[in-house]
Structures are given as structure tokens and as C-alpha cells.
Amino acid sequence: MAETARTAPAVDFVGGAVGYRFRTQAGRSHALLKATGLSPTRSLHVIDATAGLGRDAFLLASMGATVTLIERVPEVHALLADALEAARAESDELAAIIGRMTLLHGDARVLLPTLQADVITIDPMHPPRTKTALVKQEMRLLRDLVGADPDVGELLAAALSADCGRVVLKWPLRAAAPPASRKPSHQIAGKTVRYDVYVRPRAT
């Protein structure tokens, strides 16, 4: 058990950075909220196609979104399931947030054609940085567990073909985006990452 604790990433919605961001409401200005179009007056159903550590999904759910998380790696899915149940038991406030989160195990490329949502978010394993020390420990552990995401182009294509109004891809700020059937409608840039936003054209 001790070895697992040293080698597996921590998934925690109660303490750590996620808990702090929730308690202090520091996430209200997060670029992800702007990228998805989520606001206090606009509730959305969001599919997180690459759930990972669940941090983005929790942020969205804490701001009122209904979130479906898809994770294909069994070990990460199990970590997420345990963390969700721990948060549910922590307090009524957290239980209400977790109640808006549904965790699915599977390949998003297969599941997306069967689902409907307002927004699909994609945050794959990004290309390794040349300065690996800049990568936080939890992300290094996650990469060790899940490996790279060479099929991100296929996932983006599946998302763009799915029944949703908007697709949001989180990607390194200066890296070339995966090939796609169309260009992003717009981008929201941060210090090290950007959000490529694909808005489905309105039917005429």
C-alpha cells in the first residue's frame, strides 16, 4: 500500500489545491469557465472526455455545471471513484457538487457518439516539456500511469462530430494544435496553456 501511495497521483477533492480553490472561491476567474461559457446564469452539461485527476470537472461542477467524466485507464478511474465518494461523505455542500458529477469508464472516442452535451472538454497528456522539472509531481505521476495520448487527434475529431454546441481543447500555449476538421472559433490564452474553442455553427 505504501508503494502505491508513492507512485500513484493523488486525487483529492477535499484537501490540497482543489480543496483550497473551492474554499476560497479562487476558481471563479479560471479561464476554463470562460472557455466553456459557464456562468451563474447559464447552467451547462459538460462532458470531460479526459477526466484525469478530475480537477477541471470538479471546478465546473462547483460552479453549477452538470459534468460527465470519462476516464479510460482503470487505475485512474478507480482513484477518481474513491475520491468522489470521499468528498461525498465529507459534507452536504460537497455532496451536492459530487451529485452533479457522473463518472464513466471507457474510451471517449467510443462513448461520445452515444452522448449529448452542451460542451465537451479535452485535456490530454500534452507533449513533454523540454524542462521536465517544470512539470508538477502529480502530472508526472499521472503521465507515468497513463502514458502519452497519441490518439488525441482522433478524440478531437470524435468530439467535433458529437452532439454538442462547443468543444474546448486545453493545449500548451505555443504548441501546434492536433489536426482538426476546422479551425478554432477563438482561443483563450494563459501563461503556459491555451484553450482552443470550437463553437458549432448555428443552423440556418
UniProtKB/Swiss-Prot annotation:
One cellular component term from this protein's GO annotations in UniProt: cytoplasm
Family matches, as InterPro entries: 16SrRNA_methylTrfase_J (IPR007536), SAM-dependent_MTases_sf (IPR029063)
Molecular function, one GO term: rRNA (guanine-N2-)-methyltransferase activity
One Pfam assignment: SAM_MT
Catalysed reactions listed for this entry: guanosine(1516) in 16S rRNA + S-adenosyl-L-methionine = N(2)-methylguanosine(1516) in 16S rRNA + S-adenosyl-L-homocysteine + H(+)
EC number: 2.1.1.242
Keywords of this entry: Cytoplasm, Methyltransferase, rRNA processing, S-adenosyl-L-methionine, Transferase
Binding site for S-adenosyl-L-methionine: 55-56, 71-72, 123
Presence of the UniProt keyword Chloroplast in the record: no
Chief localisation class: cytoplasm
Subcellular localization: Cytoplasm
Enzyme class: transferase
Known role: Specifically methylates the guanosine in position 1516 of 16S rRNA.
HAMAP family: 16SrRNA_methyltr_J
Family the entry assigns: Belongs to the methyltransferase superfamily. RsmJ family.
The protein's name: Ribosomal RNA small subunit methyltransferase J
Organism: Rhodopseudomonas palustris (strain TIE-1)
